[in-house]
Amino acid sequence: MVDTHKLADDVLQLLDNRIEDNYRVCVILVGSPGSGKSTIAEELCQIINEKYHTFLSEHPNVIEVNDRLKPMVNLVDSLKTLQPNEVAEMIENQGLFKDHVEDVNFQPIKYSALTSNNEECTAVVARGGTANAIRIATVDNPVNVNKLAQDSINIAQIVPMDGFHLSRRCLDLFKDPQTAHKRRGSPSTFDSNNFLQLCKILAKTSLCKVSSHHKFYSTSSVFEKLSKTFSQTIPDIFVPGFNHALKDPTPDQYCISKFTRIVILEGLYLLYDQENWKKIYKTLADTGALLVYKIDIDYEATEERVAKRHLQSGLVTTIAEGREKFRSNDLLNGRDIDNHLIKVDNIVHIRND
């Protein structure tokens, strides 16, 4: 079993080491289907946030939000802007660029939009269209920390790769839609273009520095340091999740807010050495604030786990069908990951048998 408390300590130590140079740190957590990566990511996130909530309960009124008079950081200034007629055409095509659904070289583009909460934002879309959109807040709402419930301030946030599954409508437009649906979960059935763009955005926020009038000492805790270095200039970033009942992405399921100082990215292909996936590691590693974990587990242990998950999700009607789906798809994806793992020295391998 994985010691998630030890992982939490390692992540917080990285944040402590980098807090003068990086606004946030990132964690990559990779594993084959059924390896338990989602559960580990959720536990890790919960442990870190609970530790911080405990600190806040013992240190009331410690939070400060700096840089209130400065403009928000522009995270996508280099992206092409969609013109209104192009936005209308995309919406008419059910939020898709019909000629680019399989184009892994399609460059993400931006346009003005609204979040699911009807707030103004910049939407960033790629070959998956609006289903896999990243939305970045453009309205600077000043934070009144005195009105915030302490247990609502989370410094860690998970971002599953699942939200970047290409929608079923998108797969319908593939040259071979039958194979695309059958092999859903393979590398080509994710919007790797926009996930890489998300990593570029996160890297840019990671390298932001905060103006703080406080002087910290070696005895200052990491929670004390980060509590004094939140920044109003960091915009909220909304990313999609995945609805297993609907079998499609859902918009704005996760929010990486200005209080998020640790982003836990979990998924199958974040260390994959092909197409856009191969650029993710370097994009985040160049910030100097990255931890990378690969979960190793025997495939025999994952078959039953994944088969039951398929049954519960309604993808199959019997456990036998679930096992067959695992062998014909998930097992192939897991082996593909192992055969195409990027070659870097700082991947920490952990067992979850």
UniProtKB/Swiss-Prot annotation:
The keyword Kinase applies. Its EC number is 2.7.1.-. It comes from the Eukaryota. Transmembrane segments: none annotated. Keywords: ATP-binding, Kinase, Nucleotide-binding, Transferase. Belongs to the YFH7 family. ATP-dependent kinase that could be involved in endoplasmic reticulum membrane assembly. This is ATP-dependent kinase YFH7. It comes from Saccharomyces cerevisiae (strain YJM789) (Baker's yeast). The gene is YFH7.
